[in-house]
From Swiss-Prot:
Residues that coordinate or bind isopentenyl diphosphate: 40, 70, 119, 209-211, 251
Family note: Belongs to the IspH family.
Cofactor(s), names only, from the UniProt record: [4Fe-4S] cluster
Record-given protein name: 4-hydroxy-3-methylbut-2-enyl diphosphate reductase
TM helices/strands, residue ranges: none
Source organism of this protein record: Thermotoga neapolitana (strain ATCC 49049 / DSM 4359 / NBRC 107923 / NS-E)
Binding site for [4Fe-4S] cluster: 12, 92, 181
Catalytic activity line of the entry: isopentenyl diphosphate + 2 oxidized [2Fe-2S]-[ferredoxin] + H2O = (2E)-4-hydroxy-3-methylbut-2-enyl diphosphate + 2 reduced [2Fe-2S]-[ferredoxin] + 2 H(+); dimethylallyl diphosphate + 2 oxidized [2Fe-2S]-[ferredoxin] + H2O = (2E)-4-hydroxy-3-methylbut-2-enyl diphosphate + 2 reduced [2Fe-2S]-[ferredoxin] + 2 H(+)
Gene Ontology terms: biological process: dimethylallyl diphosphate biosynthetic process; isopentenyl diphosphate biosynthetic process, methylerythritol 4-phosphate pathway; terpenoid biosynthetic process
Length: 279
């Protein structure tokens, strides 16, 4: 069994920055709180909670409130700044650019955002500008529209959505903006290419991570694919595959990918190298 690891694995810069900042604050002895997962990865969150991070909405539980990488509505951010002695905004810069773009273009047409309505990033966006958030094409009486996307969406799926919307409706003016994170687009491209030579694709990441789910769907088009959060989830029959490729979401630590590779090696796999992890 040949093991190949994608070049682009591990944290993206936004996730890396968020985790490093929280760890530094905790190391300074500060009581750090947030209102949800900093990033969508169970192991990462368990580690931060063990180090002292608290998930709470009670101001008495902490001195520093950290805003998650997905962002929060602007009005909520202002309220938090009045409650806590210190608020550290860890919104990913690319996500924040989406919020700014939504506000800037809201006067030019109805905002239609390709994304999951209940995703934290989309909840935050609607605090910056009113928008329709959906993944399903629909008929509308709107004549002027602006298309945006959740930053972790599949570029191909976003384009298909916009194409269907234009076919279904009679827009007088439709503005299409690519607001998908370039880091996730590059991983998407690599998965589409590398999975073609794989018998099995192992996608490593949190089960409620949008960008990891996207990679899993893409890998499934070209090979058998499994989505795991830990090495323990790798099935015993993996040994029947000749070439196994390993991919990861942007909130997956390199240490977890190394553990997955180690488990595959224990199952008679031979590591054929890549540029993504240290061996």
């Amino acid at each position: 069994m040949k093991i190949i690891v994608a070049k682009n694995v591990g944290f993206c810069f936004g996730v890396e920055r968020a985790i490093r900042t929280v760890e530094n604050l905790l190391n300074e002895g500060k009581r750090v709180v947030t209102d949800g997962e900093i990033v969508h990865n169970r192991q990462v969150m368990e580690d931060l909670l063990k180090k002292g991070l608290k998930i709470s909405s009670d101001p008495t539980d902490g001195d520093v409130f950290v805003v998650r990488a997905h962002g929060i509505p602007e009005e909520k951010l202002e309220k938090l700044r009045k409650i806590y002695p210190e608020v550290v905004d860890l919104t990913c810069p690319i996500v924040f650019q989406l919020f700014r773009t939504a506000r800037e273009y809201s006067s030019r047409g109805k905002l239609i955002v390709f994304g999951k309505r209940d995703h934290p990033e989309m909840v935050a966006l609607m605090g910056y500008a009113p928008a329709i958030v959906t993944k399903k094409p629909f008929k509308t009486e709107e004549k002027n529209v602006v298309f945006l996307s959740q930053t972790t969406s599949s570029l191909d799926e976003y384009r298909e959505f916009v194409s269907e919307m234009i076919k279904m409706n009679n827009f007088e003016k439709a503005i299409y903006l690519n607001t998908i994170c370039p880091v996730t687009v590059e991983r998407e491209r690599e998965v589409k290419e590398l999975s073609k030579i794989c018998d099995l694709s192992v996608v490593v990441g949190g089960k409620h991570s949008s960008n990891t789910g996207k990679l899993f769907r893409l890998a499934s088009r070209n090979s058998r694919a499994i989505w795991v959060e830990s090495p323990d989830e790798i099935p015993e029959d993996v040994v029947k595959y000749g070439t196994v490729c390993v991919f990861s979401g942007t909130s997956t630590p390199v240490s977890l990918i190394e553990n997955v590779v180690r488990k595959l090696e224990e199952m008679e796999g031979k590591y054929y190298g890549t540029n993504g992890i240290q061996r």
